[in-house]
Curated annotation (Swiss-Prot):
Any GO molecular function: electron transfer activity
Protein species of origin: Stutzerimonas stutzeri
Protein name: Cytochrome c4
GO CC, alphabetical: periplasmic space
Chain positions recorded as heme c 1 binding sites: C34, C37, H38, M86
Name of the gene this protein is made from: cc4
Matches recorded under PROSITE patterns: CYTC
Length: 210
């Protein structure tokens, strides 16, 4: 791992984390509405809605906080994370509610997905090797070889995630429609190096990773 990546990991790990101190048992009683899109246990049956089960608690909490901030009426451009389907849904929830919900979904077991064999080889090449000639690091540096992520550093679990959802996020990062990757803009930088075919292959490989 080169010095630039080590520095980046330390920076994101220290400054990019949301404090997570939720109660999973309490959270179970607060996720009824979430289940309509994400599944009652966080294993979303719909490919456009992310699986939350088994996701890192710190990452989940940060996304909930960012979505709440970005969905507030009149929120300045670039603040938080804008998810149209989530508009207004988090407004009534307190910080403790968000912490409890993150803890609950993080405690659930994520379901396994499957990769398209026709795309898996190219996807694996990108995930494990990046595009070093273009300055794009391997995904394994932050998300681990098996896609479990690094919760302490706030890097999300990717393995098993719906390919359609992952592809949408990579495209949004590339196009600047998602910007909550911190001052380092690491995901925007990575996604800028990916073609549509790269994103399709990488997303499919990630869906089958476990």
């Amino acid at each position: 791992m080169n010095k630039v990546l080590v520095s980046l990991l330390l920076t994101l790990g220290i400054t990019g984390m949301a404090h997570a101190a939720g109660d999973a048992e309490a959270g179970q009683g607060k996720v009824a509405v979430c289940g309509a899109c994400h599944g009652v246990d966080g294993n979303s049956p719909a490919p456009n809605f992310p699986k939350l089960a088994g996701q890192g608690e710190r990452y989940l909490l940060k996304q909930l906080q960012d979505i709440k901030a970005g969905s507030t009426p009149g929120a300045p451009e670039g603040v938080g994370r804008k998810v149209l389907e989530m508009t207004g849904m988090l407004d009534p929830l307190s910080d403790q509610d968000l912490e409890d919900i993150a803890a609950y979904f993080s405690s659930q077991k994520g379901s396994v997905g499957y990769a398209d064999p026709a795309l898996a080889k190219q996807g694996e090449k990108l995930f494990r090797g990046g595009k070093l000639d273009q300055g794009m690091p391997a995904c394994t540096g932050c998300h681990a070889p098996n896609g479990v992520g690094n919760d302490l550093a706030g890097f999300p679990k990717l393995g098993g995630q719906h390919a359609a959802y992952t592809a949408k996020q990579l495209t949004d990062f590339r196009e600047g429609n998602r910007t909550n990757d911190g001052d380092t803009m690491i995901m925007r930088g990575v996604a800028a190096k990916l073609s549509n075919k790269d994103i399709e292959a990488l997303s499919s490989y990630i869906q089958g990773l476990h």
